[in-house]
């Protein structure tokens, strides 16, 4: 499976349900083939929405991981405490592949949410069962939030 970006849909405006439904449909088809291994191509995937990565990882993870922590977002001391834990989604169990082995193809463009999929599956599948093939990834297994850091003003016609 080639995965180019973790995006919910056109302009990412309220397509979360559509995205999840499409993923469940696709993985129902995969599950009917009873795979014990899966090849995931993340070569040109710069990341995107963590919730999309969470959905994909929930479909690939061992069934025993469902409902357990996928990742925890930890904020620094300057930011109001907003630490959040995202769990593997247990409602995906009917489509979950319960894989024994995952092969992930990477490149120097693989980043962020893509790296989260790799790193967050390893504790549940084991390092030997999440096999990374390809180039070293960006090394940005973190997320970002935007904040306005300066006041925007218009020039005034003062003398």
Residue ranges of model-derived segments:
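Gly/Ser/Thr-rich loop/hinge elements
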Residues: 47-101, 143-146
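Loop/turn elements at helix/coil->beta-strand transitions in domains of secreted/extracellular proteins
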Residues: 33-38, 66-67, 99-102, 126-130
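Flexible, low-complexity junctional segments that flank or bridge functional domains
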Residues: 1-38, 52
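Stable alpha-helical elements in mature extracytoplasmic
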Residues: 19-26, 49-56, 113-120
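Solvent-exposed loop/turn segments at secondary-structure junctions
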Residues: 5-9, 43-50, 108-112, 136-140
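Conserved small/polar residues in nucleotide/adenosyl-binding loops
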Residues: 152-159
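Structured segments of extracytoplasmic/periplasmic soluble domains
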Residues: 4, 26-33, 59-63, 105, ...
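Acidic/polar loop patches that form or flank catalytic/metal-binding clefts of enzymes
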Residues: 126-136, 140
């Amino acid at each position: 499976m080639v995965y180019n970006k973790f995006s919910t849909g056109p302009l990412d405006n309220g397509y979360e349900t559509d995205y999840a439904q499409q993923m469940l449909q696709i993985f129902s088809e995969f599950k009917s083939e009873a795979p014990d291994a899966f090849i995931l191509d993340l070569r040109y995937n710069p990341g995107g929405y963590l919730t999309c990565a969470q959905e994909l990882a929930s479909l690939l993870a061992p069934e025993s991981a469902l409902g357990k922590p996928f990742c925890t977002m930890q904020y620094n001391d300057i930011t109001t405490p907003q630490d959040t834990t995202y769990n593997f989604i247990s409602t995906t169990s009917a489509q979950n592949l319960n894989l024994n082995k995952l092969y992930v193809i990477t490149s120097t463009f693989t980043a962020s949410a893509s790296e989260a999929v790799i790193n967050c599956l390893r504790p549940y599948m084991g390092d030997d069962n999440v096999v990374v093939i390809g180039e070293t990834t960006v090394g940005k297994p973190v997320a970002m939030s935007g904040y306005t850091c300066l006041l925007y003003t218009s020039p005034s016609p003062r003398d």
